[in-house]
Amino acid sequence: MGTLELAPKITHVPSMYLSELPGPRQGSRQDAIDGHRLIGQRCRDMGVDTLVVFDTHWLVNASYHINCAPHFKGTYTSNELPHFIANMSFESPGNPALGRLLAQVANDMGVETLAHDNTSLHPEYGTLVPLRYMNPDQHFKVISVSAMCMAHYLNDSARLGWALRRAVEDHYDGTVAFFASGSLSHRFAQNGLAPEFGFKIWSPYLEHMDREVLRMWQNAEWGPFCEMLPEYASKGHGEGFMHDTAMLLGALGWSAYDAPAEMVTPYFGASGTGQLNAVFPVTPQDGAHVPPPIASSAQGYTPVSVRL
């Protein structure tokens, strides 16, 4: 019925917001902002109605969660970097019906997921920064998915991504884009050295790993990448333990995915972290290579409906 039209992996560095403001950082992230705007325009051209963002700044300790409130509006200051993002206004319509559908299909496929359509919870800046540049006119509806998963299996995140695609393609009357909002390596500069590393990667080792991953992506080496993802997420300091990336690749077919990534904003350093904007073309997949769920099959597992 519905269509998953686009699947980007995007940066959300808070220095993008600083780049708008008068001061020494003004204009310094224009390439990343332009990349967001280009991806947003592609979504418009493709008829996308809803952006689903896998947000590595939404930390959760149990289950997966979907923020699908009917409307988001407020003023945001980052608790992590309040000197970077302060008093940033935001507003976007939500899509409660799609959010509930996504959760239902994920649960049916063995990945415990809760939809929150009646909540005071606002999105985090992994969602809000991209929306600032892709959705300033509230053209798109927005859903945020928790992707800073503290006690979760990457295989379950991959399964979640595939389940969300099935929900869209099998049951939704509309067109959707999935976004993995997070960096590659995410080792922040040591306190006191942030200015020195404002435009650099923390270590040659991490930069080498990131660049090798990008080479694999551009050559569609998805089988080897999926195999190494858990170790890369750990040793490479992947943002959010790379759960956003696992979700995106799960939606794309996991190790069976067969298209090269397109770099929109080339790899760049930000406060020691490795960033980019890239688009992963959506190709036909049957999900045969997506890992089965793990948590819901564990001995002693009880569903959240019983625990609460």
What is the predicted role of each segment?
Residues 1-49, 61-159, 170, 191-308:
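Flexible, D/E/H-enriched segments
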Residues 49-55, 174-184, 248:
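Beta-strand elements within well-structured catalytic alpha/beta cores of enzymes
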Residues 55-61:
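Conserved beta-ketoacyl condensing-enzyme motif
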Residues 184-190:
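Short, conserved secondary-structure transition motifs
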Residues 162-176:
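Non-transmembrane, aqueous-exposed alpha-helical and coiled segments at domain scale
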